[in-house]
Design a protein with these regions (language model features):
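Short hydrophobic signal-anchor/transmembrane segments that target glycosyltransferases
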Residues: 23-27, 210-229
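Donor nucleotide-activated moiety binding/catalytic core segment of transferases
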Residues: 246-294
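C-terminal alpha-helical cap of glycosyltransferases
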Residues: 367-387
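Nucleotide-activated donor-dependent transferases that construct or modify glycoconjugates
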Residues: 1-14, 198-199, 312
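Active-site and donor-binding regions of nucleotide-sugar-utilizing enzymes
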Residues: 8-30, 38-181
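A nucleotide-sugar donor-handling region in carbohydrate enzymes
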Residues: 143-212, 235-239, 353-354
Length: 387
């Protein structure tokens, strides 16, 4: 009897798709596996189809709808919480009940078991970012039947915290890297020969640099003539005006981006296009400027200078949640940015050794593609034939 595996894409943006869609391409090779791709928006389906190519003809796509009432309520409730995503789960229980296994790049879907009673459905979680912040190690992670992990650092910490076991986890690498070579330099996005900085603030309301420093950072770059700037925040930052953190009990208002930066030839502003998710900007820049985004680990596939903004004056030095801040210089104020950029240019290799070691521990890399390793881990864990 075939093993029916569902891949769910249920988010407001497209940044999670590349983390699990490549696995579909490898799973269709298994004779007794049926694949169902469940999407909650036409944009999600279009992106999955684009990424998996010819494999799309060998899977079944199912569009999930949240219902009219939920869509109306989401206009208000969705400003501060993932209301629509939860409504999609609740409104499509028969579709999920028909599956044997559900593969997801997030943890909201565990509500299908914990709140909506689908006790027989088994869950697989693929990391949608390789970072080490505390949010990755929440208790809900222990509810997954199988965790597909990018590398030894996150695996060892999850096992130490009792969130998984060697039997319920597998090191598979990073399927997103099967869609793009992270170490290959991208084409230059400016023609003026200046070094390019990518500013990549997160949306988390307590730790993001955007809410307290962001406009000052943009103003500084707007008024100088030494650097180009790519402003490429986490794609969720500009999806909502209100950002709330249950973990830190903090809520912040995200103001609109001022028009004064538009048209400046040395500044590129992108609040959420496909290029924000396909590593276009990470591959094209010379210096990374950010805070807590896990994209820093994609950045160090090719070691380069990094600067981290710490507006909350976090005591980070001995905190595992901020391990990535050891990969560059940390500054607490925008006034310190010019000197930090000078040091980044004059000592480009200063953090190379730390970055190379972090990459090795964060990503398990073998001759076999990560997506193939992930597909095999799923089939071996839940039962199935050889391809």
């Amino acid at each position: 009897m075939p093993l029916t595996i569902g891949f769910l894409f249920n988010h407001d943006a497209l940044h999670q798709v590349r983390h699990s869609a490549p696995v579909i391409v490898e799973l269709v090779a298994y004779r007794h596996v049926d694949i169902v791709v469940l999407t909650s928006s036409p944009a999600q389906e279009q992106e999955v189809r684009r990424l998996i190519g010819d494999a799309a003809s060998r899977v079944r796509f199912e569009a999930l709808d949240a219902g009219v009432t939920a869509k109306m309520l989401d206009r208000i409730l969705g400003l501060v919480a993932p209301f629509r995503r939860i409504a999609v789960l609740r409104s499509n229980l028969p579709s999920f009940a028909a599956l044997d296994v559900l593969v997801v790049p997030e943890s909201t879907s565990m509500m299908l078991r914990d709140r909506f009673g689908l006790d027989q459905l088994r869950f697989v979680r693929i990391q949608h970012g390789p970072g080490h912040r505390s949010v990755i190690f929440r208790p809900v992670i222990a509810r997954f039947d199988l965790l597909l992990l990018s590398g030894e650092t996150v695996r060892d910490r999850m096992i130490a915290l009792g969130l998984t076991t060697p039997e319920r986890s597998a090191l598979v690498g990073y399927p997103k890297f099967d869609t793009v070579d992270p170490a290959a330099p991208g084409p230059p996005l400016f023609g003026n020969g200046r070094p390019t900085v990518v500013y990549n603030p997160h949306f988390e309301p307590r730790l993001s640099s955007w809410f307290d420093m962001g406009l000052a950072v943009l103003d500084w770059f707007a008024g100088q003539d030494r650097f180009n700037l790519i402003f490429a925040p986490h794609v969720m930052l500009f999806q909502r005006h209100i950002h709330a953190s249950v973990e830190h009990w903090r809520m912040r208002w995200r103001a609109a981006l001022p028009k004064r930066y538009q048209g400046l030839p040395h500044m590129l502003l992108d609040t959420g296009s496909q290029r924000s998710t396909d590593m276009t900007y990470m591959r094209a820049a010379d210096i990374y400027l950010g805070d807590i985004s896990s994209q820093i680990y994609e950045w160090i596939a090719r070691p380069r200078p990094a600067i981290f903004l710490n507006p909350s004056h976090v005591q980070w030095q001995d905190n595992a949640d901020f391990a990535h801040w050891r990969l560059g210089e940390v500054i607490d104020a925008v006034d310190a940015l010019p000197a930090a950029l000078d040091r980044a240019l004059s000592a480009r290799e200063a953090f190379r050794a730390q970055q190379e070691e972090a990459f090795r521990k964060t990503f398990s890399v073998t001759q076999e593609p990560a997506s193939r390793r992930a597909a095999r881990a799923i089939v071996e864990h839940f039962g199935g034939d050889e391809p």
